[in-house]
Design a protein with these regions (language model features):
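C-terminal motif of bacterial Sec signal peptides marking the signal peptidase cleavage site
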Residues: 19-20
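Short, structured beta-strand segments at or near domain termini in extracellular proteins/domains
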Residues: 297-311
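Bacterial lipoprotein signal-peptidase II cleavage site
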Residues: 23-27
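Functional-site microenvironments in short loops/helix caps that host divalent-cation chemistry
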Residues: 52, 56-58, 98-288, 295, ...
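A short glycine-rich, aromatic-capped structural motif
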Residues: 35-112, 116, 130-141, 235, ...
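Short aromatic-glycine motifs in intrinsically disordered, low-complexity regions
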Residues: 30-41, 203-210
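Bacterial N-terminal signal peptides that target proteins for export
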Residues: 1-9
Length: 322
């Protein structure tokens, strides 16, 4: 009997692998990587949890408070990387979508808005690479891409809410940046305005005292991720979020959902800083805000999606407490 059983187990192992996924549902762990279709962005499973959102201070006119406890009640999936030029090109080619133009680019010592500056030519003074994050895209462009992914896959693709973004960026930390409090230690993790950027662009603000070797956008994943496995969540390009920007924060909204406006929303929240951005604006609590049709050479995005009911059932991680 036992020899027959052993032979059966061996046959099953050869047929299905050691996971036995044909017989048992594989659990879905935090950090698991999902990919829903050819050309779709890789997603990382982020666990539910609670965290303190915001900071008691902030730059003048950019309040980051009041600090309040946010409860992310369900696991969700976040883009492992920012959306790349190649991925955005697939969307444009498939749909005929016309993204925003007249992108803000730096030239002749000031910001210029030429009609031919767009995501295909974001003003780097060199061609953008396919594996670099798409830039010169508006909030409206980011929404259009997410809707296309949702239609293509039948899954709930979207932008991150501002609360989800901060939770995912912190990845269990309480320091100013997910690597610590010293921005000069950040060149392993975030493409900020550094010594390479200062040498090429000569902006007035002080660079971080380190060098990642990139004077503008870097290939996604070139630098190290945070503890949740997310690359470039700080730096590279600013990331549009779903929220209508409201300051100070609403005390009543503590479940991680997006702030929505009853009428027209004049500004959307952007997060994370960029290759051109001074160090302080890469803090995980820092809030940017811009009109939803804004396009600059340092604005991009990453996507998120809700897990399906079946994926939530398979999720086996514990709740994170930050």
């Amino acid at each position: 009997m036992w020899s027959r059983l052993a032979g059966t187990v061996a046959s099953l192992t050869m047929a299905f692998g050691t996971s036995g996924c044909a017989l048992f549902e594989r659990t879905l762990e935090p950090g698991a990587i999902l990919n829903d279709c050819k050309g779709c962005p890789e997603l990382v499973v982020v666990p539910p949890g609670s965290f303190d959102m915001g900071a008691p201070g902030g730059e003048e006119g950019r309040p980051e408070g009041p600090v309040r406890r946010i409860d992310i009640r369900a696991p969700f999936a976040v883009g492992r990387f920012e959306i790349t030029n190649a991925q955005f090109e697939n969307f444009v080619d498939a749909t005929g979508y016309a993204p925003a133009a007249a992108c803000g680019v730096w030239g002749a010592g000031s910001w210029q808005y030429p009609e031919d500056a767009n995501w295909r030519d974001p003003g780097y003074q060199r061609p953008p690479m396919p594996d670099e994050p798409v830039a010169c895209v508006s909030w409206l462009d980011a929404q259009a891409y997410a809707r296309w992914l949702a239609d293509r896959t039948g899954l709930a693709y979207r932008l991150l809410t501002e609360a989800e973004w901060e939770y995912a960026a912190k990845a269990g930390t309480r320091t100013a940046f997910f690597w610590g409090d010293d921005p000069d230690q950040g060149c392993l993790y975030a493409n900020m305005f550094d010594l390479s950027g200062a040498a090429k662009w000569g902006f007035d603000w002080e660079p971080v005292d380190c060098d990642d070797g990139f004077a503008e956008a870097s290939p996604v994943g070139a630098l190290q991720p945070n503890a949740y496995g997310l690359h470039d969540i700080l730096g590279n390009v600013w990331e549009w979020t779903e929220d209508c920007y409201i300051a100070p924060y609403l005390d009543s909204l503590v479940d991680g959902s997006a702030v929505q406006s009853d009428g027209a929303c004049d500004r959307r929240s952007v997060r994370g800083g960029s290759w051109i951005t001074r160090a302080s604006r890469h803090r995980t609590t820092f809030r940017g805000r811009d009109p939803e049709d804004t396009v600059f050479s340092f604005f991009g995005f990453r996507v998120a999606r809700d897990l399906t009911a079946e994926e939530r059932q398979r999720f086996s991680g514990s709740k994170s407490q930050q």
